[in-house]
């Protein structure tokens, strides 16, 4: 059985949750995609916000051969293997390379792409959860357009959660139902990460209580699972410094009970600062 997150992945721009600033009617990225762009793109934003989904939609519309690499595991040789197919029968119209987690490529690996981006033989779509202006080589940035994906609101996430619950309902051999507030509770607890919300739906189904010959999920079940959901945070990136800055300002303002301090405690940030 396919993972729920894979089965529920949107196939069209209209199905993508949130990101109306990028994909709404008349938005720049949507127009580029619908016009069949060959531009090099960098998608920047937190996990579970649709970067990979949108890249896959672009790839399906492209007439170029699609190659996918993940920079966490790919090597320079993997990049060279992709380049070797340029102008061959494998890629007569050029190559669309989707490079996930590009921040894990070092400068030399990123530089290896430049020659082929210059001559148009390769179109690059890269995604990163880190600030691209810190982690991506300047020459690569200058040849690409950066689009920022933002965490989803609760209202944007609820339809995806409801769809996931319905799919589990269709899959289930027993009647599967849930309390009315479950979708909102799951959506509110995922921190704007749709993938996390869908994974929560899977876990709720697997842990559903027997009731009247079927399976049943309560709001309390969803709330308990949401409390286990990690807060968005990075130890060295923007979130780290934004929270510390807010902490310092709350102290200067004689507000020792500020909620931001509680956030730092929750994610176990040392208070040595």
What label would you give each PLM region?
Residues 25, 67-95:
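Short glycine-rich substrate-engagement loop in P-loop NTPases that contacts/grips substrate
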Residues 33-68, 114:
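Walker A/P-loop
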Residues 184-188, 195-209, 261:
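C-terminal helical "lid" of AAA+/P-loop NTPase domains
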Residues 208-229:
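Conserved C-terminal helix/linker of AAA+ ATPases
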Residues 265-273:
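Conserved small/polar residues in nucleotide/adenosyl-binding loops
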Residues 146-158:
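Conserved AAA+ ATPase "SRH/arginine-finger" region at the nucleotide-binding site
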Residues 173-189, 243:
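Short conserved motifs of the RecA-like P-loop NTPase core
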Residues 2-40:
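Pre-Walker A (pre-P-loop) alpha-helix and adjacent loop at the N terminus of AAA/AAA+ ATPase modules
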